[in-house]
Amino acid sequence: MDEQKGDRVMTKETVCLRIEHHAVLFALLARQAVELCGEKGKESILRGMTVYGKERGRRMACNARKRGDEINTMTNQAYGEWKPDFDGQMEFGQIHTQPTLQTYIAKCAWCDAWEKHGLTEYGRLYCVNVDNAVYQGYQDKYVCTQVTEPMSWGGPRCEFDWGCPLTPEENEALAAKKKELGASCMKDFTFHTAHLRATISRILIEDLGDDGQRAVDRALAEFAELFGQECLDVLDTVPEEEIYPKEAFV
């Protein structure tokens, strides 16, 4: 029998994390890093997000290569690793495909989570470079540029320019590829939250030493207090070799 406890979604067998958990853990790590180390903490969080994003992009590219697909802007749009928790949670799409592909996000579950928990000041650091970092991890020919101020920084919606056009034929191929792949390359947010914890923690400790470890410990304790110890413990069930598959990290 399913059981609901506050912000926790539980069954007797498992705990399933959502975008909210992912968003809040990042913001807690960012807050602790900034409060303990000021500008150095902020710089470390931003570096951590760039590393984290590039790691996601490398996994995506690995999936594309394993299926015989070229590494380009079209396939980058097809090989995403996540989907919303439920219909209507996010609102996003294309603005145009020529002269370059531009996309938008008009409703964001990360922004909603940060606002709910009073963490937007720190959560918005997630948005500074994550989309470009994922893109750069996938390929290194083009840059993803934020056309507008992100919603978390006060903008009306997030808009991105991917630096490369999609022809009508490529856009049709994109729709077909998404349909073909379905959810086969996607990971749940227990996985994504475990990846976030692993990479951001590693970078904070590398950059900030004992203060970085202290920031991580405090943030994880806050996370467990907020969502329950089981929501922290479930992160340990995600194998490191799944987060960092050898074929993507050679």
Show which residues each predicted segment covers.
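N-terminal accessory segment detector
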Residues: M1-T100, A109-W110, W114-Y126, A133, ...
